[in-house]
Amino acid sequence: NGVDGERMDIAVRDGKIVEGVNEKKAEHIDASGMIVMPGGVDIHCHIAGAEVNSGRLLRPEDHFKDVEAKTAVTRSGVGHSIPSTFTTGYRYARMGYTTIMNPSMPPLEARHTHEELDDTPMLDKATYPLLGDWWFVLEYLRDNRIEECAAHIAWMMTAIKGYAIKIVNPGGLEAWG
């Protein structure tokens, strides 16, 4: 938008920045001395899925260290290092985040990962399926069947509702036996 560090008025209508509004009817918020920016996006945060639940199982005491009581507008939640889904959503929102990307979803754990993400309030969410060690992908690549690999990945992304492919050390687990 060509704006870089300028001080100016911002008009908002229905949650979107617009050219202008009726100033006589508008609510005025004095944000002098503050930075105004759109909601934050965390492109790599492990907040749902198999690895998070393994962490919760390994840290049962974590649920007693940091309890958030129910309020008139929030549910209760727990957790210090591995918070519950509701606590996670509330804390991200308090920090100004609006969007998170969960970076590791094993395809066979997709349903549960999406259930947890759906249970996390106040955030737009997406997840990256782990396909770098997916056996079908490795076989297609080994046999130089690139178009079939692409078709399989496209089908997989649709079937498990992935946003982008997470590839970590492609073939690494397979190489180690």
Give the positions of each predicted feature.
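Histidine-rich, glycine-flanked metal-binding segment
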Residues: 2-38
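Flexible loop/turn segments at secondary-structure boundaries
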Residues: 3-5, 48, 108-111, 134-137, ...
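Divalent metal-coordination and catalytic microenvironments
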Residues: 10, 15, 33, 44, ...
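Structured loop/turn residues at beta-strand edges in well-structured enzyme cores
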Residues: 23, 95, 158-160
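Conserved acidic residues
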Residues: 26-27, 98, 163
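General beta-strand structural signal in soluble alpha/beta enzymes
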Residues: 29-30, 101-102, 127, 167
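Metal-associated gating/positioning segment near the N- to mid-region
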Residues: 31-116
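Metal-coordinating catalytic core of metallo-dependent amide/deamination hydrolases
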Residues: 118-177
